[in-house]
């Protein structure tokens, strides 16, 4: 028996070391964004590109970003375990097909705020049924609050790896909140992770009456159980448009609890949770 073990050990050792290295080597994240967007979205993009590399060094993942959406192809995506859409979606059919294939094959994705937006007619028509109706599941954008304001968020699924370290209720950074066409609570494939708690109402300051919400149920972050994905409606910083200074008044990632959700979401998507 001892001879058998000594003979087999040299053969097993490289496999053991390889498995250990695979468990400890960083997973790779690639973020796509557009450089022509409104200041509030671009502010979040700049913030993400500043801080997500820091979060990566602290949590064992690498972070790259690009404005070249032609990189949504099989060869490029094969180098990454997680894809982020910071402020947009792909518009070219070949890019969309490559992204769908990536997700169908088990890739990870997290989309923020405007990455889920579609409205017909607009510059971003709802012309991608799989993405908006099946994958994200929310359909078209319907309305939003204004100005960007903080909300009290409720953790709806306390067992999901992205939410386990969160308190049951927490205050978000100021954000422009979206209402959607479809009722996600009626979709059995959707697991709602975060929602706006009723103590947040009235939410928004107007000046238009419909920009202030007084009641209702509004999902903020969710996952589609058929895919390795999370959509997060947060991603719109407050900007001083009214006075014409365009000064940044708030930052999404200036919130330790909110950052904890993003980090744990990425770790789950990267296969580490």
Segments and roles (model prediction):
Residues 22-28, 43, 51-54, 58, ...:
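Extracellular ligand-binding/catalytic regions of CAZymes and related secreted enzymes
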Residues 89-165:
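A glycine-rich, often tryptophan-bearing local segment used as a flexible ligand/cofactor-contacting loop or short
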Residues 1-24:
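Bacterial Sec-dependent N-terminal signal peptides
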Residues 23-119:
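Helical hinge/lid and interdomain linker segments adjacent to catalytic or ligand-binding clefts
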Residues 47-51, 94, 98, 130, ...:
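Extracytoplasmic/secreted proteins, especially bacterial periplasmic and envelope-associated proteins
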Residues 73-74, 160, 251-255:
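Polar helix-capping/helix-linker motif
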Residues 36-37, 71, 90, 116-118, ...:
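Short, solvent-exposed loop/turn segments at secondary-structure junctions
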Residues 144-231:
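Catalytic beta-strand/loop cores that center a nucleophilic Ser/Cys/Thr
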